[in-house]
Design a protein with these regions (language model features):
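N-terminal leader/linker segments that initiate helical-solenoid repeat arrays
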Residues: 3-5, 13, 26-170, 175-176, ...
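Canonical tetratricopeptide repeat
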Residues: 139, 180-181, 214, 247-248, ...
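Short coil turns that delineate tetratricopeptide repeat
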Residues: 131, 172, 206, 239-240, ...
Length: 503
């Protein structure tokens, strides 16, 4: 089977307000080597966003009322957007979910457990009283994107687009709305557009944290990893802090440098003080540990995340995956059932379906089929609302749907962007359609950066065996199972069978 990767929640990013976040003194920079430390760009450029207005008169509100509204808005918008691949994909390139996706967003340092529905209601009330507040419209657009993520409802994207356009009509080119456009583009998997919007902000505000982070995300999702690494260095020099540190870590993980990734995340967690920051960074550490097969550490980190915010979905899903890999399948099923009840996204739906299949009890096959059907329904809804869902289609359909559709989608996604994830998806779609010779180069490309991913190694091993490369195939399958022996309820079992048959 083609197991989905544990979602990498990359895009826990800065506030929609665009204000500077001062890192904790204990957080430091991203743990860079000394030669990089010597090249710090500590000078903070002038902030040019509308948040710099201090007289409160620009939109007709008195200073006290303006400040109160901003504080209330920040509290309500206390969840971060992910990039589209991150938020909705069956696997992430930038992965930490991704997403995301994937994209400019709200501050993880705000109070945990904030409700996007409440934020939308409050903003709508505010905008009825202040219809010319371009900041308010931009924030509403970002909140609709966040609402789509947390609800698994792409139908919010047209509403987000309308709100952002309203903001830009009132104040052409304002940073917050352009950052919102980057978030929306990433959520719809338009990473070229997201990069363009981020660059637009950075041209006149090079210290805009949301745009710096969006730029890294977009470059990662486009497979431009060397540029993403340079963008991470630039962001770390200009705006060191948790949103940048997590991206810096992921860029290193993609290169196979897990040690640096872990060190940077641990430093970020040491400096985290708010519930949102703690939940976010601990989840990143949990996902990194899970990917390396260290389930005990993964569960410890997910527990730490949930102690900070017991509603944080990526931690709940990650804990369920680690439980499944540790043999706690009843707890894993219960946990994933709760996750999909709140956000029925492809990653969690496929994971739950495969757990049902692996359990093999009465009615479990039908339960699994329902999860896979829901994936297809979500993909149809996503496409109807402007989301490029080809990667989701390729990954889900290759094992649990129309194999021909999986290959068509994988080819289409590969034509748009060459990443380790799109290479893996194309390789596996080619394999299940009987095109193993063509699949081989893509399977090897998926592992060429050094990224340590058991699913990729499993796919590579199966393709190598199918093309007569028995020694290499056995080595790849062995590496997959040594790295993460519980990487998938179905895939891990099939890897063991294939390895045994190849002896």
């Amino acid at each position: 089977m083609a197991p989905p990767d544990a979602p990498r929640v990359l895009s826990r990013t800065p506030k929609a307000t665009g204000t500077a976040r001062t890192p904790s003194p204990t957080a430091g920079r991203a743990g860079l080597p000394d030669h990089h430390q010597a090249n710090q760009e500590r000078a903070m450029g002038p902030r040019t966003s509308s948040d710099e207005q201090t007289d409160g008169t620009a939109d007709g509100r008195a200073p006290g009322r303006r400040t109160a509204w901003r504080v209330a808005s920040a509290a309500l918008l206390a969840v971060a957007l992910t990039g589209g691949a991150v938020a909705f994909g069956a696997a992430r390139d930038g992965g930490r979910v991704a997403p995301v996706t994937a994209s400019a967003a709200m501050d993880p340092g705000a109070p945990a457990g904030a409700d996007p529905d409440a934020a939308v209601a409050a903003l709508q009330t505010h905008l009825k009283a202040q219809p010319k507040d371009h900041d308010g419209w931009a924030t509403l657009g970002l909140t609709y994107v966040e609402q789509a993520r947390t609800k698994g409802d792409p139908a919010r994207y047209p509403q987000a687009q309308a709100a952002l356009r309203r903001s830009l009509a009132l104040a052409p080119g304002n940073d917050r709305a352009v950052a919102g456009q980057a978030a929306l583009a990433a959520a719809r998997h338009d990473f070229t557009g997201a990069l363009s919007h981020a660059d637009r902000v950075l041209r006149h505000n090079p210290y805009a944290e949301d745009a710096l982070c969006s730029r890294i995300d977009a470059l990662v999702e486009l497979g431009r990893y060397a540029e993403a690494a340079r963008a991470a260095d630039t962001a770390d020099a200009r705006k060191p802090g948790i949103p940048v540190f997590t991206r810096y870590a992921y860029v290193h993980e993609l290169r196979g440098d897990v040690t640096t990734a872990r060190r940077v995340l641990q430093r970020a967690l040491t400096g985290a003080t708010s519930p949102g920051d703690i939940a976010y960074v601990a989840t990143q550490l949990g996902q990194l540990a899970w990917n390396q097969g260290d389930y005990k550490t993964a569960l410890t980190q997910y527990a730490r995340a949930l102690a900070a915010d017991d509603t944080y979905l990526p931690a709940l899903e990650g804990r369920a995956r680690a439980q499944a890999a540790s043999g706690q399948r009843a707890a894993a099923v219960k946990g994933l059932e709760a996750v999909v009840a709140r956000a029925p996204l492809p990653t969690s739906l496929v994971a739950l379906g495969e757990l049902y299949e692996a359990r093999g009890g009465a009615g479990d096959r039908e339960k699994a089929r329902r999860q896979y059907t829901l994936v297809q329904a979500w993909i149809a809804l996503a496409r109807a609302n402007g989301v490029d869902a080809d990667l989701d289609t390729a990954l889900a359909a290759a094992d649990h749907g129309d194999k021909g559709a999986a290959l068509r989608a994988a080819r289409a996604e590969w034509a748009r962007r060459h990443t380790v994830h799109t290479a893996d998806a194309l390789a596996w779609a080619l394999h299940v359609n009987g095109h193993d010779t063509e699949a081989l180069a893509h399977a090897r490309e998926a592992t060429a950066t050094g990224y340590r991913n058991a699913s990729f190694l499993y796919h590579r091993g199966v393709v190598e065996l199918a093309t007569g490369h028995a020694k290499e195939g056995r080595a790849s399958l062995t590496a997959a199972l040594q790295l993460n022996p519980g990487f998938s309820p179905l895939g891990a079992a099939e890897a063991r069978k294939a390895l045994e048959a190849a002896k």
